């Protein structure tokens, strides 16, 4: 996994006994952002590093966001998740609320950087990162704004149920025919898996020989971001893709209804959960091919504009 990119330098910070490693990328002096503007970048779910890269799928989402922000004059901090890359700890043993506290520590570290105006800091989250960004924004009216990309406005259990239906609908007909022949239904299999996870008590468990972050799953299933969305008083940019089958666009529309601050909603046609363009049917089966493409300039430009517009700082 890549840990740095052009123009950035390593930065470490602590949360309790854990040391998290990241990259601080200064904004270009030629950018249009007000002096001292900065953003904390929080990646999505899974064992991903500061660039949003996992061993099985390198999406480089946050690396590309950081580069676009830097060009606009916005500094940023992105970091490896606990137990991933150069960060200490055990990824599988960490819960959702551990990840939230790690992000809170990252926000404090960013505000402490030289040249960063503590009152001109944004939080930008993608997928799980959007859930985390919601929690930070709900508790911090000092933020200049928050960006929620592929966010959620329902419990994790509801989101996963929607995902199961969407994935089943995206399968080729021969596969769905075979599943019916074998009397296997994806939604039913999902329910059984969730029941097993709910019955667990440890931080980690194995399901079909695969190590699973059970505590994170239990916390995610029960977590409802709605009360925190209602508590947000800072400007919000919520972005969704019409081809996202992991975070349905209706969640972003609901975010607009719940958040108390100034909210901008953007739905990008044919954008997937990986923030790539997909002209064909929405499916996770093309993720590896999608990851070879760059993140859509549309979403990068929306984020950069939001972070450099004076109205977002009021």
Regions found by a protein language model. Give the residues of each.
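Accessory cap/linker subdomain of secreted extracellular hydrolases
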Residues: 147-219, 226
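Short beta-strand/loop motif that positions the catalytic acidic residue
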Residues: 232, 238-240
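N-terminal cap/lid segment of alpha/beta-hydrolase-fold proteins
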Residues: 1-37
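Catalytic active-site module of serine/aspartate enzymes centered on a nucleophile-bearing elbow/loop
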Residues: 271-275, 279-314
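Conserved alpha/beta-hydrolase "acid-adjacent" motif
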Residues: 245-251
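Short, surface-exposed "cap/lid" segments of acyl-processing enzymes
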Residues: 29-68
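Alpha/beta-hydrolase active-site loop
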Residues: 61, 93-113
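Primarily recognizes the serine-hydrolase "nucleophile elbow" in alpha/beta-hydrolase
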Residues: 105-115, 119-174
């Amino acid at each position: 996994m890549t840990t740095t990119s052009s123009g950035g330098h390593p930065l470490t910070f602590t949360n309790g006994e854990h040391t998290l490693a990241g990259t601080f990328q200064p904004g270009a002096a030629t950018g249009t952002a007000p002096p001292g503007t900065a953003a904390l970048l929080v990646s999505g779910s899974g064992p991903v590093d500061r660039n949003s890269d996992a061993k099985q799928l390198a999406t480089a989402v946050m690396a590309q966001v950081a580069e676009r922000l830097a060009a606009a004059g916005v500094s940023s901090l992105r970091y490896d998740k606990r137990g991933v890359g150069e960060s200490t700890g055990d990824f599988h043993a960490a819960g959702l609320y551990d990840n939230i506290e790690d992000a809170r520590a990252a926000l404090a570290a960013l505000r402490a950087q030289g040249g960063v105006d503590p009152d001109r800091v944004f939080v930008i989250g993608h997928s799980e990162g959007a859930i985390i960004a919601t929690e930070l924004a709900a508790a911090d009216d000092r933020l200049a704004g928050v960006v929620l990309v592929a966010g959620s406005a329902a419990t994790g259990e509801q989101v996963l149920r929607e995902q199961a239906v969407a994935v089943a609908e995206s399968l080729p007909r021969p596969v769905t025919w075979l599943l019916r022949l074998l009397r296997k239904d994806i939604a039913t299999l999902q329910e059984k898996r969730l029941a097993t996870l709910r019955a667990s008590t440890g931080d980690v468990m194995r399901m079909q020989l695969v190590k699973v972050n059970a505590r994170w799953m239990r916390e995610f299933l029960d977590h409802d971001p709605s009360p925190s969305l209602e508590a947000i008083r800072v400007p919000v940019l919520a972005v969704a893709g019409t081809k996202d089958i992991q975070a349905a666009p209706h969640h972003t529309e609901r975010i607009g209804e719940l958040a108390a601050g100034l909210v901008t909603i953007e739905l990008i046609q044919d954008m997937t959960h990986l923030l790539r363009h997909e002209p064909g049917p929405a499916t996770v089966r093309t993720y590896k091919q999608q990851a070879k493409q760059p993140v859509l300039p549309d979403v990068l430009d929306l984020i950069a504009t939001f972070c450099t517009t004076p109205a977002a700082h009021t």
